[in-house]
Each structure stands twice: as C-alpha cells, then as structure tokens.
Amino acid sequence: MGCCSSASAAQSSKREWKPLEDRSCTDIPWLLLFVLFCIGMGFICGFSVATGAAARLVSGYDSYGNICGQRNAKLEAIANSGLDHTHRKYVFFLDPCNLDLINRKIKSMALCVAACPRQELKTLSDVQKFAEINGSALCSYNIKPSEYTLTAKSSAFCPKLPVPASAPIPFFHRCAPVNISCYAKFAEALITFVSDNSVLHRLISGVMTSKEIILGLCLLSLVLSMILMVIIRYISRVLVWILTILVILGSLGGTGVLWWLYAKQRRSPKETVIPEQLQIAEDNLRALLIYAISATVFTVILFLIMLVMRKRVALTIALFHVAGKVFIHLPLLVFQPFWTFFALVLFWAYWIMTLLFLGTTGSAVQNEQGFVEYKISGPLQYMWWYHVVGLIWISEFILACQQMTVAGAVVTYYFTRDKRNLPFTPILASVNRLIRYHLGTVAKGSFIITLVKIPRMILMYIHSQLKGKENACARCMLKSCICCLWCLEKCLSYLNQNAYTATAINSTNFCTSAKDAFVILVENALRVAAINTVGDFMLFLGKVLIVCSTGLAGIMLLNYQQDYTVWVLPLIIVCLFAFLVAHCFLSIYEMVVDVLFLCFAIDTKYNDGSPGREFYMDKVLMEFVENSRKAMKEAGKGGAADARKLKPMASGASSA
C-alpha cells in the first residue's frame, strides 16, 4: 500500500495538495475485505435463524428440547420430547433465582406452562390449586396436578417454594420474578467484592426508589450539554472565562456542600432512629465522607492545573472563536453524535440478538441431568470469535465514519474561500463523498484500531482470570502490556483522525494520508501541544461543569431521601451518564478543532499568500497560533524551528 515505500515518500514530498479538487476511490481492497467480513456476519445470523435458534430464543424451550407454543418433533433418546405445547406459551423455571455464572445459564429445570403465577405460591397445595384453576401445571409433565401433594417426586420435579410472583417478559415469553430480591441475588453473584448481602439489597432498593430522580437528572445533563454547545456557538469569546469561573465555583460549592452534609448528618441525633434506618444512615455517612475527600483532592488538583495554564487561557478564546464560526455555518454538526449513537445502538441490538441466537443454536445434546442443551460442534463453534471481532471492527468503523464525515464537512468549510458558496448541507455532501470514495480508508483505519484493541482485551481478560493467582512480576508485566497497548491505541486513534482529514482534503489512501498527517504534526509539534493542551483542557472543564452541576442537583434532590434509601449508587449512575453525554457533545467540538488545525498547518505549508497561492485560513486562527508561539517562547519552551513570524492573510509572506 506504500506505507513504508521510500519512493512513495519522495513522491509525497513533491506532490502539491489540491484541496477538494481531485477525488478518487481510496483503499478499494480494504472495502472489499470489509464487505466480505460483513457478509460473514450476516451468514452467522442467517445460520442461527435457519437452524431454529430464533424460535427457541423468542418462544423459549423447556429442558427436554420442546419449543413452547407449538408442536414439536420427537428427539431421539430424549424423554418428554416431541410434546404438543400449542397452549403452553411461556417458559417457567422451577428455581429462577439459581444462576450459574460460569456457564451463563439458570441452573433450574424449565417447563412450558400456560400461564405465569401472578401471586406468590407458598405451598404445594397453592401450586395444585393454581394448576386446577388456570390449567397451568408448574410441575414436571410426568406428574398430574392431583398428585402434587401425594408423590415424593414433588421436591425434585416441582418448583422451589415459595414460588415467587412472576410476569411474562414482553416478546420473549419467559416467566420472570417481579420481586427485586431475586435480581439482587443475581447482582450479588456478579459483584463479588460485596461481603454484606444487606448492603447490596439497600443499594438496589435505592436505585428503584430514586428512578424518577435519576431519569430527571439524566435529562438535565442532556439539556446542559446542549446549552453549552449553544453557548460555544454564540459567545465563544466569553465562554473560556465563564467556564473557568463556573468550574471554580462549582468545584468549591460541590466540595463545600459535601462537607456540610457530612458534618450535619454526623451531628444528627441517632437515639430515636430505628435499626434499619440507622444502618442506612451509617452507609450514607460513610459515602459522604468518601465523596467529600475525593472532591477535595480533585478540587486541589484542578486548581493546580489551572494555575499552571493560566497564561494560556486567553489564547484559547481565539481558537474557540474560529471553531464557533464552523458551527454557525454547519449547525448540523451538533446532531452528529445522535446519528452515530443511533447507528451504534442499531448495530449493538443486532449484535446482541445474533449473540442470543448463537446461544440457542446447534444440535440437541443430553447433559448429565438428562436435560437438553444445544451445542455447536466442528468449525462452526468458532463463529463466536468471529462475532466478537465483528463487534469491535464494525463499532470502530461507525465511529470512524463519524470522524470522516466531520472532517469532510470542516475541510469543505475551511477551503471554501467565499463562505457564501458553501454547499447547502456540507454534512450531507461529506457523507456522499464518504460513501462514494472513502469507505475503504475508513475500513482500514478502523481495522488497525481493532488489531490493537483485541490483544489489549485478551490481556485484560487474562489479568482478571489470574487475579490473586499470579506472582507480582507477572502482574506487573501484564499491567504494563495493557497500559502500553492502551497508549498505542490512543496514539493511533489520534493519527487516524488526522489521516481521515488528509484523505478528505486530498483524496489519498490511508497510508499516504497517515504519513502526510504525521509529518505535518511533527513539523508543528509545539503548536499541536499548545492547541491540544489548552483546547482539550477547556473542553474538559466544560465536561466537569456539566458533571458538577448534575451531581450537585442530584445531591440536593437525593438528600431528601436519605432517611429511607441509600443514594450512593443513584448518584454514581447520574454522574457517569452526565459525563458520557457531555463527552459525546464536546468530542465533536474537539474534533472540529483538530481538523481546523491540520487544515491550517497544510495551508501555511503549501501557500505563502502570493498571487495564485493565497491563504485559505481565517485571520483569527493565524493570530491565535502566533500568540501561542509567543507565549511558549516567553515560557522558555520556544525553539528555533518555530521562530519564524506568521504573517496575516493580506501580507503575502510565507510561513511554516
């Protein structure tokens, strides 16, 4: 592909970039490979459906291989198979709360029943009465309802008492317990570090009790993120100082409120509190102390960082001003995270559904207990691994399509001299160019990220499986490898994004674009450091502002429920969601800034302002980089390589 060809490198150094002029298809072999891979993903789904996995997944099946809600064929050498379950449409587990995490299944006999027990059944007499009234037998098919209380087999072939009240899961015809205590047992099996079962029960009940508040706070974080995007668009000059002041006030206010609540709850009388509420109060007090200490440490670190970067804050105003102009001309950029998230959700839903199909596909095999399991044998058993690789590659492909779309739109904006001549919808024009010319480049870039991500995930899995068993040296080596792969993945992701920008500008293949982008970034290393440090930090402050505001609102609202619920987990859920929402919105802004800078660097390298080679850039952006260079030089970090004076657009002087 020319990634390492010296001849290609020489040709690249002589080649002149012609933004938006020549357009051709790039990395076609990689597009064909990606299409073939997607066909393989479709084959896995089709194979699962064709072998009956879809019917077994949706309708469910009992422990003898009979699909509920239909007539079944007899399975060789398997008792109770081939039954007519036309009127038995629901799967009922005799012990639904008994979960086997290792084998990812419920360790219980499953039967097809006509109806789920809506009320708790405490005795076998209640089970018998339920069968006689509703015509739904909850014991094995070999036992008649009249024999439930008479036979000794009832303990093994009837449900575990008491039978919890259950309701059918929509679309999947499984009887699921409605009592959250059963789900608490599931979570207890997953969360092994919780030693006190009652703690987990209180945490889950806290989430269930505060679900309306959690939903409202999540919506608040979404609204705050959109408001921040509007502020960035219209008042970018004031935004930096507003963010700085608000983050200072927010971090101080949040830390102060946490310490105030801790002191208030610690001084509150406990003599009149009942034992159940006393335990909840102690949990809240401990959580408040941890939150307060963490917030204090975070605030101190944040202030130190802001103190070091105070001289560069003013420079960020110019950068945000130019990026704000992009959003004024390209307002649809704000909604790009929604389309990407929607595409990811659709793919993940398809992937999970196919994964569930794979869990019920294969040939019927009788296990040691005499029950039926479906297993895949031969080469087809490796479809799982293919499916997992598909999850990573296609997810990265969707994210890369977003990067290429944003890069194409911003490149169109930057290299259009008269902004009145911009396409009616630059975003759609960029999507059109992506589909027509550059899907192969996106496929190749996302595959490279996949190659790094898979080994890191394997090492993380090995590390988790060997936790507590390996020696200190092996543990250190594993963690070092994981960290190195993570750093490599981040570096490649940043280089990929700039490679997509280079492809959007000059329509070159991935290797050529990555090499050109890398050379330009190295030539402008000091400028990259200044822009990325200041710009990314201010966007990080925006994320902190949204999380602090949402968290502060959550503290005030959940504080009214501290007498009857533990709000540690609800607050964590809200803050995590707020950060994810803020990250999705502000990452687009960060992407625009990176694309603008690469366009600027290319502009200054290949144009000098003379007739026929006029600059494309905005004057504000050039002034920003010049001021950044001066600031770094005054700090003693400027170098001779960056000592040339940048000239404004009208001057006609060259600059690098």
Swiss-Prot record:
Taxonomically, the superkingdom here is Eukaryota
Q: Which residues are glycosylated?
A: N134, N179
Task: Describe tissue expression.
Answer: Expressed in neurons, oligodendrocytes and astrocytes. Also expressed in the mucosal cell layer of the colon. In the developing brain, isoform 1 is expressed in both neurons and oligodendroglial cells, whereas isoform 2 is restricted to oligodendroglial cells.
- The record's principal subcellular location, in a coarse class, is membrane
Q: Which reaction is recorded as catalysed by this protein?
A: choline(out) + n H(+)(in) = choline(in) + n H(+)(out); ethanolamine(out) + n H(+)(in) = ethanolamine(in) + n H(+)(out)
Read off the lineage from the record.
Eukaryota, Metazoa, Chordata, Craniata, Vertebrata
**Modified sites of kind Phosphoserine:** S651
Q: What is this protein called?
A: Choline transporter-like protein 1
Q: What does this protein do?
A: Choline transporter, acts as a choline/H+ antiporter. Also acts as a high-affinity ethanolamine/H+ antiporter, regulating the supply of extracellular ethanolamine (Etn) for the CDP-Etn pathway, redistribute intracellular Etn and balance the CDP-Cho and CDP-Etn arms of the Kennedy pathway. Involved in membrane synthesis and myelin production.
* N-myristoyl glycine lipid attachment residues: G2
Q: Where is this region: Disordered?
A: 635-656
Any one GO cellular component localisation term in the record: mitochondrial outer membrane
Q: Could you provide one GO biological process annotation from this protein's UniProt record? A: transmembrane transport
GO molecular-function terms, A-Z: antiporter activity; choline transmembrane transporter activity; ethanolamine transmembrane transporter activity
Q: Which residues lie on this side of the membrane: Extracellular?
A: 51-211, 259-287, 336-337, 401-441, 558-565
Kindly indicate whether the keyword Transmembrane helix belongs to this entry.
yes
The record's section on InterPro entries has:
Choline_transptr-like
**Location in or out of the cell:** Cell membrane; Mitochondrion outer membrane
Sequence ranges on the Cytoplasmic membrane side? 2-29, 233-237, 309-314, 359-379, 463-536, 587-656
- What upregulates it? By leukemia inhibitory factor or retinoic acid in vitro. In vivo, induced during the axonal elongation period following axotomy.
Membrane topology classification: Multi-pass membrane protein
Question: Would you identify the family this protein belongs to, as annotated?
Answer: Belongs to the CTL (choline transporter-like) family.
Tagged with keyword Transmembrane helix: yes
Alphabetically ordered keywords of this record: Antiport, Cell membrane, Glycoprotein, Lipoprotein, Membrane, Mitochondrion, Mitochondrion outer membrane, Myristate, Phosphoprotein, Transmembrane, Transmembrane helix, Transport
Q: Where does the chain cross the membrane?
A: 30-50, 212-232, 238-258, 288-308, 315-335, 338-358, 380-400, 442-462, 537-557, 566-586
